[in-house]
Each structure stands twice: as C-alpha cells, then as structure tokens.
C-alpha cells in the first residue's frame, strides 16, 4: 500500500493532478445540508479536515460562515485555495496532519467529512474516530459522506460498508443518520452514505 500517511504522497498527487475522486464542485448532499442551516450556525466553529481543493470550504465562506477551518497536510491545495479566496482568513488555513491537531488548541461545533475518511489508511480508522471525538465540543456533530462500497484496491479512495462504519463510530458517537444519500453527484449515485452523528458525552 502506498504511503498515504505522508504529506509528500498527497503533494505529488496534487502536483500531477492525479486526484480522480475530485468532483470539481461542492458535493450536492453537503450543499443541501449547508443551505438549510439557520443564520445562527454561521458563527459556529467548523472544521473541514483533509479538505483538498476544499469546494465546501469555499461555499461556506461564500455563504457568510465566518469560523471555518481548513486542514490539509499537502501545501498545494491550501495554496490554490488561498489564491481563489484571498479574503479567507489565513489563520484558518492550516497545513498540518489532522492526527496531530491538539484538542487543547482546537475545538469545533461540527466537522464536515468529505473524502477524508476514505483517503486515510484503513488501519487508522479507529484513530480517526478518536481524534474526531476529541476535537469536537460537547454535543458536537460530524456531518458528511462516506463511500458505501468496497473498492477492493490498495490505494485511495478506500471504501467500506455501513456495518463496518458503525463498528468504528459507535464507541464515541451517537449515530443519528447513516443512510444512502438520495442526492449524490450523478457518478456517485448509489455509492454514498450521508452521515450525521453526535459525539457522546
């Protein structure tokens, strides 16, 4: 398995434009979720980890969300995002390893998951869940999409099943929604689960 745990792996992918899973737009289910949020949500602390080209971060910014943090450990997509959104607060663009973020320094009301879970080595999925729970404030939420298929491959994206995901998340989260997405991007119809879960007290 290629070393997806290293920033160099992802930096090279972006430099070579070898990011076949990139949709080039905001994911429709996540756009729909964002669009129904109340005005009061626009000041909440939101994390988008492993954001890549960060279309969702850009959309949140355009809609007036003022406390969104983008994290990726490849410099290339962060630099590209900063070029596209010169008014985005630079202190919220973090080039770092998600697993090394300090919960003492960072706490979020909710996290948006979009093709990050599928990019990490599957052996780190429990570690992902633990770190995600640690970075969320009490009653914090994890919102997003997970692939609902096994790609049977040794490189990202790495898929899985609903039953497998439940086993990973149930220890630290109350799963409110983990169901097939009805409004996925056409090429992903039938292969995504929409998730909404709340960190356990």
Please name every model-derived segment.
Residues 115-119:
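Short catalytic micro-motifs in class I SAM-dependent methyltransferases
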Residues 112:
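A conserved beta-strand element that flanks and buttresses the S-adenosyl-L-methionine
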Residues 1-48, 52-105, 120-201:
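Class I (Rossmann-like) S-adenosyl-L-methionine-dependent methyltransferase catalytic domain
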